[in-house]
Amino acid sequence: MLEKNLLPEILLAIHMPLNKGLTRVKAIVIIIVVIIAVIAGVVGYYLINHPSNSVTTSSSSTTTSSSLSSTSISSSTTNITSSQGITVFVAGAYLAILNYLADQFQNATEIPVHVVGSGSFALASQIASQTPVPANVFIPVAYIQAVELTGSRNPGWAIAFLSDQMTIVYSNYTTKSPYWSQLYSNYTMAMETNNTKYWYNFFYLLTTRFSLGIANPNTDPEGLYAYLILQMASYLYANHNISYFVHLVKANPNVKVAPSTANYVAPLKAGTLDFTFSYVSYAVSQGLEYLKLPPWLSFGYYPNETTWYSQFAYNISVNGQTLTIHGNPVYLYITIPLNASNIQTAYQFIGFVLGHESQLTRFNVIPIQPALLYNETSNIPQPILNLLKSGELKYAGNFSEV
């Protein structure tokens, strides 16, 4: 150690003979210098080998902080893994409803739900083509064929749990059109009297004097419904010429085509688009105005009208397939794609949705109670069979019966 190494030098300086020109004073000075060096060495050695309390506290604090940060990251990762979040693909018009349900579900279970909205047919195409399966739950609207379009991921079953109806949506800007008063007066008289003349005038003005948003029927059922409504109106009010108003729309340069009706909200609110065909619930959720359609044109849940709806059809093309889709009521379906991950949480979410249908009337949809189970295979999962046995579901038949 340092102090032991210097000890002989101190002793040597004390007993050094006073010769060779050294005086006693010089000897004392040397001794003092050596002693100071020894003391400094001792203090330095002690500080190096015995850190002060303040240094220890600081070091301890830094270590503790680092440990907490590491624990937080680990905990966060664990929570994400254990919470088993799910992704829900939903028809774009029902984003508001599903975001509401997702928040309620997460509050009740602490399981996060990621909601993705788009046209039902487009979402089905994604489920069919992407690997791994991109959605844990699929909620298409209107046509059960959207479930069949998931290809090898088609689960063979779907539950209809909400009903809606078509309408013609507009904003306050639309009422400033020079043709608005004429259109609205004919609409009012048509709804009151069901006179063919007023209905003809209404649809003629709608299809020729206004800008219209009609979603691509190959990606969004709302576009498909729009053309079916025009077919029915043509048959009823234009001398049974089923294509009359369809041709007028296709000749109108102010018809805007988009992948989803969701694309029309901003133009409607900005006044750059006059009308679009959509669901009542969508108009309400977006704070837009709408013209209600009579039961025979609305595709609502009217049992006496279902045969009438089915007499009209429109061809669409999805994934290279041409499909003829017949009219049927606007139902919102829920299912789990085949080979989807995290299916236990997906079943839990379905049970939650079916248990909270009554809360959704605020969105102007009609809960179907009990919900209707459709299938095209005998392989109905046990959790769904349990819901059927408990009475929460009612068997409604094969896909072909929708």
Swiss-Prot record:
It holds the Pfam family SBP_bac_11. InterPro entries: ModA/WtpA (IPR050682). Residues 53-79 are annotated as: Disordered. One of its GO terms (biological process) is molybdate ion transport. The keyword Signal applies. Keywords: Signal. The keyword Signal applies. SUPFAM superfamilies: Periplasmic binding protein-like II. Residues 1-44 form the signal peptide. GO terms for molecular function: molybdate ion binding. Belongs to the bacterial solute-binding protein 1 family. WtpA subfamily. This is Uncharacterized solute-binding protein SSO1031.
